[in-house]
Design a protein with these regions (language model features):
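Alpha-helical residues within the helix-turn-helix
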Residues: 16, 27, 56
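Residue-level signal for the short linker/turn that defines the boundary of a DNA-recognition helix
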Residues: 9, 20, 46-49
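Short alpha-helical DNA-recognition segment
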Residues: 19-38
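Short, charged recognition helix plus adjacent turn
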Residues: 1, 66-69
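Short, conserved catalytic or interaction motifs in soluble domains
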Residues: 41
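DNA major-groove recognition helix of helix-turn-helix/homeodomain DNA-binding modules
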Residues: 49-64
Length: 69
C-alpha cells in the first residue's frame, strides 16, 4: 500500500509576496486569522471552495499554492 499523500501549501509565501498579514487575508476571504494560520502550518486543510477563494485572492493557480508531498 502506498503512503498517504499529504496536502501541503505555499500560502505563507504567496501571502507575504502580496504584503498581506494573516488578518488581512482572512478578512479578504471571509475566515478567521486562526484559520489562515492553521492552513499555513498544515494543521487544517481548506475546503475546495476556500482553496479556490484563496487562489483568487492571491492571484495564484491552485497548483501554485497547493501540492501533495
Amino acid at each position: 500500500m502506498k503512503d498517504a499523500l499529504i496536502l501541503k501549501n505555499r500560502l505563507k509565501e504567496a501571502r507575504t509576496e502580496k504584503k498581506l498579514s494573516q488578518s488581512a487575508l482572512a478578512q479578504l476571504v471571509g475566515v478567521s486569522r486562526n484559520t489562515i494560520s492553521s492552513i499555513e502550518t498544515g494543521q487544517f486543510n481548506p475546503t475546495a471552495k476556500l482553496a479556490l477563494i484563496l487562489c483568487i485572492a492571491l492571484n495564484k493557480k491552485f497548483e501554485e499554492l497547493f501540492y501533495f508531498d
